[in-house]
Amino acid sequence: MSELFVKELKVQSIAVSGFTRSGKAMMMKLLSTYDRIDKPSEDIFLEHIYFLHKINKISDQTAKYLLKKNFNILYYFNLIGRNINFKKDDWSSALNYHNPKMYTERLNSTDLNKRLTNKNKIIYQMMLHTGLNSGKLLLSSLPSLKIIEMVKNPIEIAYSWIKKNYGKNIYNKPTIYAPTCKFKKNIVPYYASGWEEEYLKMNEYDRVIKIITNLFLDREKEIKKLSNTEKKRVMLVFFDTLVTQPKIELKRISKFIKRDFTSKTLKLLTVEKIPRSLFSNDYLKKIKFLKKKSTPKIFKKLMIYEKKYLKNLNYNKDD
């Protein structure tokens, strides 16, 4: 019997991963200003491969095949200028790259072999929503991939999700980004797979908080599954450390990806209003809001992850 096979495309690649609303777009814009880093790319279909694998809808073999095949084609399309985004206000637009001419040249170039050799060693950059939660699958499928995982305060993520209505019954829309499942005539996000009954009984606030605390727990478990070699291909970047100590973090990123940041990187920090203070003025108001709207048990779990997050920042709220 024949087996699925994809020849590995050995190209340096970096994925910026993290939960929705965790600072991935900002990180990708910063990376784009580094020496020899491609502009950001995103592909919903590649992401859905590991999303569906996470909830056991596709096998290991099929997921690995599709990830490899999809990555190869995405990289090829990027080289020839196919599907390049020129929408001015979009974070992934070629027009927002420091050298947009490079992408217009790709559109007109016919020398594909020259591009495939990648003599300038330009690192391909892409976004992965919740990618590290499938880190073992991704790193084993794509041996040249490194992952920068954006980690943000769970209070900020929960509040942001609620303001975006992610806990409401919005998942029947045909253009919804996240994978969706049908359960007893109800459409729920894939995050609720395995606890659909509980999800449907919850209010919108408890739904969001439980999803987020589940994601934090799942990411912790996934990191523990990685071998020591795989862990060296992963870098955690805490959002608040990045915005309060940017130059320290930029140097740490440089060491990880083996690329220097540039004067354009420093200019972008100014545009993004970095450095910033550790907490926004309304941080305590957000905590009070979440406490008021959620049930005590659910809120308590959220605060456990907030405490873990602050511990990583060496910050003690009680000081």
Residue spans for each PLM region:
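PAPS-dependent sulfation machinery
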Residues: 42-126, 180-197
